[in-house]
A protein has these predicted regions:
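Beta-sandwich/jelly-roll carbohydrate-recognition scaffolds of carbohydrate-active enzymes
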Residues: 2-219
Length: 219
């Protein structure tokens, strides 16, 4: 593998700064759709995540606040919005839920192959009750079918024989990230996308969602 197309880090960094940096570095995108590299299993509630999926050119209309109502100052603008979250996956071993913030992470490697457009997360983990597993998360966005975002999870149990449950979520009303302390981003949490018609076809979940003001919709 040519080194200039490959980047890898090791270790279970849990700082807020490291997690947000990892979401940026290990994102998946193809020019049409982009997904930040947040952990599939999520973070504890005390951590901030800029969890997001975006479609290029898919926008809504929002008010542009001005200090004064003067002639020539714009009052509305277009804004990109966070579309439905389809990357979240809970992993349960019996009554224990997998998380890098609990138990013991014996090995954590995270990499991105820029030539193939693939990100990998490899983990050797021991649960608080001693269940030992290996996990590999493999993700990519397709350059052949641009709307396609793929996730592959490989799980190997080493000393546990019992129920393993993976719960994949499809959340249709994601909100745009906000941080009142950061002047670079919005200070108010805003929801631009609203789910209209959720339903399932076999193992496939579908959610039709519409923007609040631009009149755009997606499924």
């Amino acid at each position: 593998m040519e080194k200039q197309f490959f980047y890898e880090i090791e270790g279970n960094a849990k700082s807020q700064e490291a997690l947000l940096l990892g979401e940026t570095i290990f994102h998946n995108a193809n020019g049409y759709i982009g997904i930040r590299g947040a952990y599939e299993e999520g973070y504890p509630p005390e951590y901030i995540s800029i969890r997001g999926q975006y479609i290029n050119g898919f926008y809504d209309i929002t008010d542009m606040k001005q200090a004064e109502a003067l002639c020539g100052l714009i009052e509305k603008k277009q804004t990109m919005l966070n579309i439905a979250d389809t990357q979240s996956v809970e992993i349960w071993l019996g009554g224990e839920q997998f998380s890098l913030f609990y138990g013991t992470a014996k090995e954590v490697k995270r990499s991105v192959n820029l030539k193939k457009g693939v990100t990998l997360r490899k983990i050797a983990w021991v649960s608080p009750e001693g269940k030992e597993i290996s996990l590999q998360f493999r993700r990519m966005t397709s350059f052949v079918k641009l709307p396609l975002f793929l996730q592959e999870i490989t799980l190997t149990c080493h000393n546990y024989e019992g129920e393993v449950c993976l719960i994949s979520s499809h959340f249709g009303e994601a909100e745009n990230f906000c941080d009142p302390s950061d002047p670079r981003v919005a200070g108010e949490k805003t929801q631009y996308l609203f789910a209209d018609t959720p339903h399932c076809q076999g193992d496939i979940s579908l959610i039709l969602a519409k923007t609040s003001r631009s009149g755009l919709s997606l499924c």
